[in-house]
């Protein structure tokens, strides 16, 4: 009986670890500063680009002037990086599968944005953009330093400055929010 209890306890402890998603694995890798595998990197980048494009298309419809301007830049730039990544994969330089849809985490964020309006939309959108770009910069830095595919590693290094600029733009947009909100109330 005691062995059964111990075995059950071990399974209960191990189950969450076995059920980790790619994002959680790369989250742990991020904390440790470890480069993701090529397949994890490709998947995370593709999902990130899809999220950036879709959330920014919403901002083009629902956002204020500053959010719309930022969103237009994000749609342009992330469409470009998506096309480049697809070219690396389809050209055979990178052996990985590209996801065709958002994962559940990003889909729920997108659904939250779809439901928001006005200043609530702007606050959510801006917060999500800062967070997404911090994650992207970290992901690209780690792969550019320690990735195992030379072509993808080179691309990550070349793409990184644009992502760092996006992060700065998102942070500036976030800093401008309280001032814009106060100005709108007058």
Regions found by a protein language model. Give the residues of each.
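His/Met- and acidic-residue-enriched segments that coordinate or traffic transition-metal cofactors
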Residues: 2-6, 19-186
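N-terminal signal peptide c-region/cleavage motif recognized by signal peptidases
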Residues: 14-16
């Amino acid at each position: 009986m005691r062995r059964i209890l111990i075995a059950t306890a071990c399974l209960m402890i191990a189950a969450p670890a076995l059920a980790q998603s790619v994002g959680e694995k790369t989250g742990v890798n991020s904390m440790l500063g470890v480069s993701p595998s090529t397949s994890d990197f490709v998947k995370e980048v593709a999902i990130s680009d899809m999220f950036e494009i879709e959330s920014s298309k919403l901002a083009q419809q629902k956002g204020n002037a500053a959010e719309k301007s930022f969103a237009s830049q994000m749609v342009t730039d992330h469409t470009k990086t998506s096309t480049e990544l697809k070219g690396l994969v389809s050209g055979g330089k990178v052996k990985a599968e590209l996801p065709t849809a958002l994962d559940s985490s990003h889909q729920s964020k997108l659904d939250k944005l779809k439901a928001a309006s006005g200043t609530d939309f702007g606050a959510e959108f801006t917060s999500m953009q800062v967070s997404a770009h911090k994650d992207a910069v970290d992901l690209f830095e780690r792969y550019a330093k320690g990735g195992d595919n030379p072509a993808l590693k080179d691309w990550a290094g070349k793409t990184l400055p644009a992502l760092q600029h996006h992060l700065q733009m998102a942070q500036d947009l976030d800093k401008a929010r309280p001032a814009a909100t106060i100005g709108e109330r007058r």
